[in-house]
Amino acid sequence: MEDNKPVPPQTKPLDQDEILKTVMKEIEKTYGKGAIMKLGDKSNLTIEAVSTGSLLLDEAIGVGGYPKGRIIEIFGP
């Protein structure tokens, strides 16, 4: 005897890039523009910063040092 269970509709799996963009939009909506900053991105926002003491690192961070009032994470080799 066959099961007459309804078949769920097929949905297109979300692309990782789409998921990331959606999450980033939600974070910016909740916490404000500039809440997520990528290393090396130039920002048009005026953000007060504390120098790291390294001109190269300050330039790489993008705002001239560690941004004040924000949680930062730097990782890598």
Curated annotation (Swiss-Prot):
The keyword DNA repair applies. Coiled coil: none annotated. Gene3D superfamilies: P-loop containing nucleotide triphosphate hydrolases. InterPro entries: DNA_recomb/repair_RecA, P-loop_NTPase, RecA-like_N, RecA_ATP-bd. Keywords: ATP-binding, Cytoplasm, DNA damage, DNA recombination, DNA repair, DNA-binding, Nucleotide-binding, SOS response. GO terms for molecular function: ATP binding; ATP-dependent DNA damage sensor activity; single-stranded DNA binding. GO terms for cellular component: cytosol. GO terms for biological process: DNA recombination; DNA repair; SOS response. Its main location: cytoplasm. Transmembrane segments: none annotated. It is found in: Cytoplasm. Can catalyze the hydrolysis of ATP in the presence of single-stranded DNA, the ATP-dependent uptake of single-stranded DNA by duplex DNA, and the ATP-dependent hybridization of homologous single-stranded DNAs. It interacts with LexA causing its activation and leading to its autocatalytic cleavage. Belongs to the RecA family. This is Protein RecA. It comes from Spiroplasma melliferum. The lineage of its organism: Bacteria, Bacillati, Mycoplasmatota, Mollicutes, Entomoplasmatales. The gene is recA.
